[in-house]
Amino acid sequence: MNQEDPKKFGLYIHVPFCSRRCDYCSFATWTDREHLIDQYLTACKTQAATWTPELPVITSIFIGGGTPNLVPAELLMDVVADLPIATDSEFTVECNPDLVSSDQLETYVHAGVNRISLGVQSMVPHVLASLGREHDPTNVQSAVKKIRSAGISNINFDLIYGAQGETNEDWQTSLEKALSLEPNHLSTYALTVEPGTPLATDIERHPDDDDQADKYIQANRLLTGAGYSNYEISNWAQPDKESRHNLLYWNQGEYLGLGVAAHSHIGQKRFWSVRTPERFISAISKNSSVEAGSEQLDVEGWALEGRQLALRTSSGVPEEFIPHEVRHLTQPADLDGNLKLTAEGRLLANEVAVRLR
C-alpha cells in the first residue's frame, strides 16, 4: 500500500535536449537532436493523451532534462494543456540560468507553472569550468529577478560539490552567494562519477570521499543555520517549501513519466521508456508501446523499500527496524518511536539502509 496520500499523483516529463553535455552527466540527453524537438514534444503530447482517461487529478508536475527551457515554451506547455491538473498543483520546470527569459516565463506562468528549479551547480567560475558547465554564475541573479518579476516566488537551486579544485572556501562562497538570493529550496549533490562520462575517464578530476563528507557537513551547518530544514539527505527547504513532487517519490507515491527514459510508478508496478528520441518518436507514431522494462515488488520488498526511502528523510524509521550496531548514527527516538539519522549518519545512509530489517 502506498505510504503517500492516494489522492496525490505526480507527472514527470523528460526533455532530452541540451546545448552542451556536462562532463559528469549520464542522463538521457543529446546535444545534436534539436531538429527533433517539435516531433518529440508532439509525441509526448500524444503519449499523454493515451493516458488521460485513466489519470487521477495531477497534484505535482516536474519537467526535467536535459534543458527544458532550451525548447520553445509554447510547445512544451502544450504537452500538459489537456491533462487533469489540480488548481493547487506544484508545477516545476528545470531551467538553465543563462536561458531564462521573460517571454518564456510568461508562457510558463500562463500554463500554471509556479516553481522553477535552477541548475546553478556552483557560484564560482573555475568550479563551473571543472564541471564542464558553460553558464555564467553572474546570470543566476538576473534569472532569479526575472523569475520573481514573472510572479513565480518558489525557486530551487541545484548545487554540486566535490569538483576538482573546489576548496572549502569555494564551497562556502557558493552557498553564501546562493543564500543571498533567498531561494526557497536548495538541493546539494555530491559529484558522482558515472560510467561512460568524460569525468569517468579523467581520473585526476575524480572527487575525494573525505572532502565530499566535509562539504556535506559544511552545507548542512550553514543551511540549517539559515533556517532551512534538511528534510531529505540532499535537500533543504524553508518552512512549507519542501518539494511536493520529490516527496511523492520518497513516499512511494504514484506518478507517470512522459518521454524518453522516463520512469513511472502506478499501482505497485514500475516501468520505464525507451532511451532515444528516435525510438520514442517512432514508437508513438506507430501507436506502439514505448515501455523498455518494468518491475513489480512483492509485499515484503515493497515494505523494505519504504523503510529505506524513509531513512533518507526527516520522517525516520521505526526503531525496531534499525539494528543496534548502527544506532550510533541516529538521533534519539522521537515521540512516534522513529529513529532519524544524524548529519554524520546521513553520510552513511546507504550502508545503514542495507542493514534495515
Please provide the spans of the model-predicted regions.
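A short, conserved structural fragment
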Residues: 330-338
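A short beta-strand-turn-helix
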Residues: 1-5
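Short amphipathic alpha-helical interaction segments
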Residues: 321-331
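Local cysteine-cluster metal-coordination motifs and their immediate loop/turn environment
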Residues: 14-29
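C-terminal scaffold of the Radical SAM
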Residues: 6-10, 30-51, 57-321
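Hydrophobic residues in beta-strands and at strand termini
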Residues: 15, 95, 341-342
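Short, amphipathic alpha-helical interaction segments positioned at domain boundaries
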Residues: 344-357
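Beta-strand-connecting loop/turn residues
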Residues: 18, 184, 254, 337-339
